[in-house]
Amino acid sequence: MGASEQPPQRLARPADAPAISALMRASILALFPAFYDARYVESAARFIGELDMALIDDGTYYVHEAGGDIVACGGWSRRNRLYTGSGSSEDDGRLLDPATEPARVRAMFVRGDWTRRGLGRAILERCERDAAAEGFTTLALMATLPGEQLYRAYGFGELERTMVRLPDGVELEGVAMERPCAPS
């Protein structure tokens, strides 16, 4: 595959879960150290690198596969949960109202040796298109620092910088962001 070619994108399947989980952890361990110290990286790998199977079950999670390996993953949700890693709440599974609430961009990860090749952007484009087709007019996400540049380049605006408390008490700096969906 040439440097400018993207590996194909497809919907994630339940059988992909082990490979996706491994990619999430590997991506965190490779990319987070440039932004966070070791304690934060290990906590993020443990709690943020946890796959929410509802994304796959809902048909809103995508992967790019190259040579039989999943090299990028990400998706969106019509459910209330904004990110994995904060523990769960009763309201996480609530379906969002597309007329008044933003769809959630979730669990975006790219393998370290596949960054800067347009895979994250391709997943965001798919998320936006599919969410807009279901009536959503806005996308929201909680960015970790390694992903902030991608989201800004895609047109997400910062709502606020915040500290995300993980279940072990570690507080990880994040950025709440939103952008309008292009009309479908």
Which residues does each PLM region occupy?
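Conserved acyl-donor/pantetheine-binding loop and adjacent beta-alpha core of acyl/acetyltransferases
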Residues: 58, 65, 71-115, 130, ...
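Conserved GNAT-fold acetyl-CoA-binding loop/helix
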Residues: 28-50
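A short beta-loop-alpha structural element at the N-terminal edge
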Residues: 8-22
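C-terminal "cap" of GNAT-fold acetyltransferases
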Residues: 137, 142-148, 154, 160-184
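Conserved acetyl-CoA pyrophosphate-binding loop and the N-cap/start of the following alpha-helix
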Residues: 114, 118-126
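Short loop/turn motifs at secondary-structure junctions and domain boundaries
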Residues: 52-58
